[in-house]
Amino acid sequence: MAEAAQAPQQQFAIQRIYLKDVSFEAPSSPVMFQKEWNPDVKLDLDTQSRELGQGVYEVVLRLTVTVKNAEETAFLCEVQQAGIFSAEQMEAGQLAHCLGAFCPNILFPYARETISSLVVKGTFPQLNLAPVNFDALFMNYLQQQAQEGATANA
């Protein structure tokens, strides 16, 4: 009896999640603690990935939170949350989505918790970052790349 050849199945696994870099600065303290608290929060985020070996990738999620109060920087918090992931038997588009959206979705709660903890340790009111839709950000990135490619070819 002949067995039908089976296509290789996609495999994904988390090998490690770790804190790669962290920084917390409160340049206006202790004067800031005496002012009325009316914060202006700015969040910048970025992702980066690189191949470590065949089918093994490091993904780094960078979050920078800048909080100003009365036009002065109350605090600046930077976190690089990283993970090592194995992703095998994926087509190029699937792999790009995995590294650009799926893995950052896994890393974000860890980065959010680190930021919240640092802010509280700086004795500022707790900061709870809203969830981020990395799938939508990734789709916007793809659309932007397509538009830039079309402009370059025109």
Curated annotation (Swiss-Prot):
SUPFAM superfamilies: SecB-like (SSF54611). GO terms for molecular function: unfolded protein binding. The keyword Chaperone applies. Keywords: Chaperone, Cytoplasm, Protein transport, Translocation, Transport. It is found in: Cytoplasm. Pfam families: SecB (PF02556). One of its GO terms (cellular component) is cytoplasm. GO terms for biological process: protein folding; protein tetramerization; protein transport. InterPro entries: SecB, SecB-like_sf. PANTHER family: PROTEIN-EXPORT PROTEIN SECB (PTHR36918:SF1), PTHR36918. Belongs to the SecB family. One of the proteins required for the normal export of preproteins out of the cell cytoplasm. It is a molecular chaperone that binds to a subset of precursor proteins, maintaining them in a translocation-competent state. It also specifically binds to its receptor SecA. Homotetramer, a dimer of dimers. One homotetramer interacts with 1 SecA dimer. This is Protein-export protein SecB.
